[in-house]
Amino acid sequence: MDINIRDMKFSHDGILKRALLDIDSWCVDKGERIFVYGPSGAGKSTLLNLVSGLLSCSEGEISVLGERLDKLNSRQRDRFRANHLGYVFQSFNLVPYLSAIENIDLARNFSTRKDRLSNKLNASELLDSLDLSSEDWKKPVSLLSTGQQQRVAIARALVNSPEILIADEPTSSLDQQNRENFMSVLMGLVERKEMTLLFVSHDMSLTQYFTRVQALNDFSKTD
């Protein structure tokens, strides 16, 4: 089991009666591809941030890959995330004046799992598999198209060979063609590398790609 949440509550203000998320039990098995949907403000991004350790729960247990995140301090959670999780953000979160390979380096340098040479080869392989030419690797990402920037974001999330990939509305800024291309590339990499995928989106047309589709309010008692 890759993700196991029990008796978990999260509140921004610490008042649990006004918990944004209240989950009795929720599990994700290894290799599952989970699509979570729900209205804006329901707590979908908060769920991802809790699972990735960007946030700490107010009460209860969050186990990811057998590690109790609720028992770790902020620095330990950051290290765990760098070593075991990949994150694709809605807004890409790329550094615009850095090249594609330099943006990937930022993620790689946080990980303690692999030496620089093996990661460098992995980064080159990823960029090549995502149809980015060696010339594109060297350009500031601000000069790349939206679709190319999204591919750089995927490569950055995957460069440390994460066991779990987390994606927060990653297709929201893409047109239909780029959205289809993105999903084809993403799912191909996820299946080839046998990763668990936790994906949040409003776009129900994407559900065909997933092994489980679940509304957030099916497992979270939110007001």
Could you describe each region identified by the protein language model?
Residues 60-68:
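Conserved ABC transporter NBD signature motif
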Residues 161:
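Conserved catalytic motifs of ABC-family nucleotide-binding domains
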Residues 52:
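Helix-to-loop junction immediately C-terminal to a conserved catalytic motif
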Residues 140-144, 148:
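Conserved ABC ATPase signature
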Residues 98-107:
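Short coil-to-helix segment of the ABC ATPase nucleotide-binding domain corresponding to the Q-loop/switch region
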Residues 165-168:
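Catalytic Walker B motif of ABC-type/P-loop ATPase nucleotide-binding domains
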Residues 68, 117-135:
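Conserved ABC ATPase "signature" region
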